[in-house]
């Protein structure tokens, strides 16, 4: 998985409903990632994305709006190894 890849992300909103959208993987490192999406994602929710070979999972630490969309910072789960 490379930066600028399109990925399908999923999370549960505060009421427990499954949500999902397409995102652009802006940045990734061993401790987390930054995704660009078209809608806000609540802070603290668990979010995941990936392919059959690798599933990424973590928690939303920030979600800020910029001119081209929302940027979501994800801290990987402590058990996750990239």
Give each language-model segment a name.
Residues 1-82:
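Structured alpha-helical
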